């Protein structure tokens, strides 16, 4: 609908389309990943291994970058309404979406190159083969993902919505409008939902991966194995 109908081509809806596109690509890999876990091997060859692993990273980064840009977009709309007339256009939203995919390619393309299939214990595994020393590049990759796909976006989103709420609060106090007061409460709830959903969805996996990478834990512990 967003692609076909002109009325839907607002900056916000174009960002939503980008989220939907990233999620659709990720969904297309689920049958292969499900089969891998059920069969305990990778029967689909190296080409699909490269595609599936790179799409995972593309989805992670494009989704988070898009959500972050939506926060910046809302901040500009609320705090700088005059600038918003020039910034919040469909053409610029499309350009930003393209830039998001280009930035995500900085991770997605190397992942595609490093993804390989290897025999292991009578099965085939789809894995990332890092340059030597592999432990070092594996650790660097996980730290970079943690910073740029979680910590930095959370900071940007929190700052944007915090400034937006301060602006709306000052407007409400100046006008004393009950309608603006209700609007502030609605937007406050929306902010809590957006930031809360972001943290709830991404924090567990990012924290688990960074702890797994940096902390010396017993990987044979049944609780650790269960968490995997």
Curated annotation (Swiss-Prot):
Keywords: Cell membrane, Disulfide bond, G-protein coupled receptor, Lipoprotein, Membrane, Palmitate, Receptor, Transducer, Transmembrane, Transmembrane helix, Ubl conjugation. Detected in myenteric plexus and smooth muscle (at protein level). Detected in brain and intestine. Ubiquitinated. A basal ubiquitination seems not to be related to degradation. Ubiquitination is increased upon formation of OPRM1:OPRD1 oligomers leading to proteasomal degradation; the ubiquitination is diminished by RTP4. One of its GO terms (biological process) is neuropeptide signaling pathway. Its main location: membrane. It is a multi-pass membrane protein. Belongs to the G-protein coupled receptor 1 family. G-protein coupled receptor that functions as a receptor for endogenous enkephalins and for a subset of other opioids. Ligand binding causes a conformation change that triggers signaling via guanine nucleotide-binding proteins (G proteins) and modulates the activity of down-stream effectors, such as adenylate cyclase. Signaling leads to the inhibition of adenylate cyclase activity. Inhibits neurotransmitter release by reducing calcium ion currents and increasing potassium ion conductance. Plays a role in the perception of pain and in opiate-mediated analgesia. This is Delta-type opioid receptor. It comes from Sus scrofa (Pig). The gene is OPRD1.
């Amino acid at each position: 609908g967003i692609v076909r109908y002109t009325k839907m081509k607002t900056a916000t809806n174009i960002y939503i389309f980008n989220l939907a596109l990233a999620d659709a690509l990720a969904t297309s890999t689920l049958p292969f990943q499900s089969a891998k876990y059920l069969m305990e091997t990778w029967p689909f060859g190296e080409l699909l291994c490269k595609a599936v692993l790179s799409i995972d990273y593309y989805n992670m980064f494009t989704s988070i970058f898009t959500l972050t840009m939506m926060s910046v977009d809302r901040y500009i709309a609320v705090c700088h309404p005059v600038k918003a007339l020039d910034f919040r256009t469909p053409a610029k939203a499309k350009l930003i979406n393209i830039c998001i995919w280009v930035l995500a390619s900085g991770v997605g393309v190397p992942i595609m190159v490093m993804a390989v299939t290897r025999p292991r214990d009578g099965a085939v595994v789809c894995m990332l083969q890092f340059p030597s020393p592999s432990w070092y590049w594996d650790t660097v990759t996980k730290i970079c993902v943690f910073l740029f796909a979680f910590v930095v976006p959370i900071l940007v989103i929190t700052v944007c919505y915090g400034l937006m709420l301060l602006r709306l609060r000052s407007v409400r106090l100046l006008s004393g409008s009950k309608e603006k007061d209700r609007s502030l409460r609605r937007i406050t709830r929306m902010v809590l939902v957006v930031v809360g959903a972001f943290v709830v969805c991404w924090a567990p996996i990012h924290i688990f991966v960074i702890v797994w990478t940096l902390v010396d834990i017993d990987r044979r512990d049944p609780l650790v194995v269960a968490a995997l």
